[in-house]
Amino acid sequence: MKGLDFGYQKGQQTLRDVSFSIGKGEMVSIVGRNGAGKSTLSKLICGFETPDAGEIFLNGKPLAEENIRRRARHIGYVMQNPNQMISKTMIYEEVALGLQRSGLTEEQIREKVEATLKVCGLYPFRNWPISALSFGQKKRVTIASVLVLDPELILLDEPPPGRISGTIPTSWSSCGA
């Protein structure tokens, strides 16, 4: 990311001259007060918003050349509220949803989904309705739904509930991060 500027209203910049790079395999937290622009930054990376200036790169290629659909092949985005992401009634179905049009066989989908559910500690609940889950468990389902797609970049707009040593989200670390 280089020289990124963005404002929702003309003359009021939310982000000004933001520049940084993240290496493959790195885990980075962007911390700030409410309204500091953390969610805005995620929206810009995903292509939901367009920067006023600057460029965003993924693997050295400018993301401006990619539409939202193509970016989604490379970027997994976990929203703050899992209820805004969940569209299926059962855990297994929700995690499998993103793979349905991937060209994988049903057996390959099953293997990937089950492996991801095991990593995220959700396998015993795979046939449960999502409505039976707590907010934190729903958040884990949305993380699993992103992890199963194996994106190059994963954005968590808000850390999941529960922490280890006050820094690493428990459910994120149990999902293999």
Specify the residue positions occupied by each region the protein language model found.
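The feature captures the beta-strand-to-loop junction immediately N-terminal to the Walker
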Residues: 31-33
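Helix-to-loop junction immediately C-terminal to a conserved catalytic motif
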Residues: 46
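Conserved ABC transporter NBD signature motif
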Residues: 54-62, 71
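Conserved ABC ATPase "signature" region
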Residues: 107-125
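Conserved ABC ATPase signature
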Residues: 129-133
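Conserved catalytic motifs of ABC-family nucleotide-binding domains
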Residues: 150
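Catalytic Walker B motif of ABC-type/P-loop ATPase nucleotide-binding domains
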Residues: 154-158
